[in-house]
Amino acid sequence: MQVEVDLVIKMIGMIVIGALIGAVTNHLAIRMLFRPLEAKYIGKYRIPFTPGLIPKRRDELAANLGRTVVKHLLTPEGISKRLQQPIVYQAITRMIQQEVQKWTRSTKTIREIAERFVANPEGKLQQQIEQRIDQELESMAVAIKTARLTEVLGEGGTTKIKTAIPGMVEVLLHQTEQYFDSPAGKMKLEETVAQFIQSKLGGGMFGMLLANVNIVEMIQPELKRVIQGKSTHQFISEMVEQEVHTLLERTVGSLLEPEAERQIIERMKSEIVTRIPLAALLDTPLHEFLEPLEVRISQEMVPMLSKQMVNRLIEQVEQIMATLDLETIVREEVDLLDTAYLEEIVLSISRREFRAITWLGGLLGGLIGMIQAILLIV
């Protein structure tokens, strides 16, 4: 009886010892995946199996994980497929619409927004406007200077000038007639006649004789008749028309001195700049410009923009991924992870499985111990 009890105790002991050995061995094997974190030495000799498998092969793990992510998880095809889903388009549209609403209802002025990016926006904008206007006016001046005056005025302007010539001649002759009828005109005639007699006849007898005759009274009616004559009117009209025609055929550049041209440009620029209410525009709240356009921007432009953005992303997704180099990013991020933290991640995912492996080791060890005990008894 005592022998049987001893055999049972030995059998149980062998089973327990086998189970403990199996469980401890498996638990130790699992721990050796992560620990120790660094190589251990006895003197100058490294202890085998140190560091643990994962710390030892950390670089290979990071590289393989990076390749796996790029080749099998985050692929261009998968991302393109995801981008084509309506939820992505809707999310982008909604995000842009929210930004548009924020800007279209903003009470901030253009000046406040501009001052975030540039100092003294009004002065710099004024300078740029003046430079731009100056360039445009210079360009216009170059084009205009090579054109004939008749081309600049156009057919309508040229016709108006030519139509006005008869009236101008009429006014000119009328003013001339009135001038010679006036005391100043008579005095001028007397001076002219006196100078003529003095220069041509001198102080001789004939000159003294003419000096006593009122020649102006004789000339004035005749001069008036000539001025009022149709032939004079026609002659003056033809002469003016010829001069006007000659003038209209000249280029604008031939009529302007460089200094006069510069003065005209400066005056035009000054006039344009003073008419631009730049300060008032910069101090206007942003919503006053954009709020009337909010519905059109949000309902028409934003969906179109979102669609174009998604299509562009789909077209460029492979190039974007190549530029981002996701494999390198994953590898570098895994390399940066603390090994203890990496161990915690793996254990948090596989803790039950590792525990089951430990119990399985204990079970197998116990079975082996039982088989050994049976063989020992037999």
Curated annotation (Swiss-Prot):
Record field: transmembrane: 5-25, 357-377
Family annotation (InterPro entries): DUF445 (IPR007383)
Gene Ontology cellular-component terms listed: plasma membrane
Signal peptide extent: none
Main subcellular location of this protein, as a coarse class: membrane
Superkingdom of this protein's organism: Bacteria
Membrane-related topology note: Multi-pass membrane protein
Subcellular location: Cell membrane
Keywords: Cell membrane, Membrane, Transmembrane, Transmembrane helix
Family: Belongs to the UPF0754 family.
Name the record gives this protein: UPF0754 membrane protein Exig_0680
Organism: Exiguobacterium sibiricum (strain DSM 17290 / CCUG 55495 / CIP 109462 / JCM 13490 / 255-15)
